[in-house]
Amino acid sequence: MVSSPARPIRIGSRKSQLALVQTHWVQGELQRLYPDRQFDVQTMSTQGDIILDVALAKIGDKGLFTKELEVAMLAGEVDFAVHSLKDLPTRLPEGLILGCVTEREDPADALVVHDRFKDHQLETLPEGTVIGTSSLRRLAQLRHHYPHLQFKDVRGNLNTRLAKLDAGEYDALILAAAGLQRLSMADRIHQLIPAAVSLHAVGQGALGIECRAEDPEILELLKALEHEPTSQRCLAERAFLRELEGGCQVPIGVNTAIADGTLTLTGMVASLDGQRLLRDQVSGPTSDPEALGLALAAQLKAQGAKEILDEIFATVRPEA
């Protein structure tokens, strides 16, 4: 009896250029590791891709860039989905898990400037310079350090945002360095913003692959892409965010590092106007990263983080 060939593995992806570059990288790595298997990409648009005329914080962020892919996984239409980990909620739908975290690229935020500001760094931009960002996290931290700058919401994919900058709608943009690097646009990075000024988003720079919890075949395939140090760092970050009941659209930032078996997690919570900014740090063994995230959340809550976040949740309510 001749055995039937293994079924194709279906990978879910958003349709944006960055999402496809990331998904095709995963597809290529799996094809290289498992040359006898077939990996097909299926694309779909998410709510976050479709609604471009409303600030992200006003839409709400529960599955904004992931829900449609998750529905497809639960329906058996795709086997796993590739996400920018920073877009993946810390609480996943029942039946789905974070199956793999890939090696992280530079998680820093980057300053991209219009040509007329090419001789400036972030700290030398003149009063009234218009900075484009859709992130409340970046907004709050930059307002804290540079209250003389002006900030304006910017939506759309990376190419759209850069086109708006080049057309003069903005003087500068704050973007994720990893996204620019993955799209071969590293030359647009004018300055990497130091962690002392802007802590990055939870999971920024890493890819998170979401799959069905009860799918041992897929989980086994994904093991080959897991990068343990990145996973440990991101587990700590995600536990911190989850405990604070924050999403990707609140002013919560992190930074993590591993040295000699010790993981150090720095976290930040800020008010929208940037006037109140809480920042603290914990260190501990890499063997229990989630415990570190929970400990740091408790420390910041004791300093008033919950009150700051409650005010934000009352102010920035998702539109119906």
UniProtKB/Swiss-Prot annotation:
* Any one biological process term the GO annotation gives: chlorophyll biosynthetic process
Where does the record place the modification S-(dipyrrolylmethanemethyl)cysteine?
C248
Please give the PROSITE patterns that the UniProt record associates with this protein. Answer: PORPHOBILINOGEN_DEAM
EC number(s) of the enzyme? 2.5.1.61
Give the cofactors, semicolon-separated: dipyrromethane
Superkingdom per UniProt = Bacteria
Pathway it works in: Porphyrin-containing compound metabolism; protoporphyrin-IX biosynthesis; coproporphyrinogen-III from 5-aminolevulinate: step 2/4; Porphyrin-containing compound metabolism; chlorophyll biosynthesis
Q: Which reaction does it catalyse?
A: 4 porphobilinogen + H2O = hydroxymethylbilane + 4 NH4(+)
Describe cofactor binding as the record notes it: Binds 1 dipyrromethane group covalently.
GO molecular function terms listed in the Swiss-Prot or TrEMBL record: hydroxymethylbilane synthase activity
Q: Which GO cellular component terms are attached?
A: cytoplasm
Q: What is the enzyme's class at the highest EC level?
A: transferase
Q: Supply the alphabetized keyword list.
A: Chlorophyll biosynthesis, Porphyrin biosynthesis, Transferase
Signal peptide range in chain numbering: none
HAMAP family according to UniProt: Porphobil_deam
> Which protein family is named in the record?
Belongs to the HMBS family.
The record describes the protein's role as:
Tetrapolymerization of the monopyrrole PBG into the hydroxymethylbilane pre-uroporphyrinogen in several discrete steps.
**What other comment is given for this protein?**
The porphobilinogen subunits are added to the dipyrromethane group.
* PANTHER family xrefs: PORPHOBILINOGEN DEAMINASE (PTHR11557:SF0)
Assembly and binders: Monomer.
Q: What is this protein called?
A: Porphobilinogen deaminase
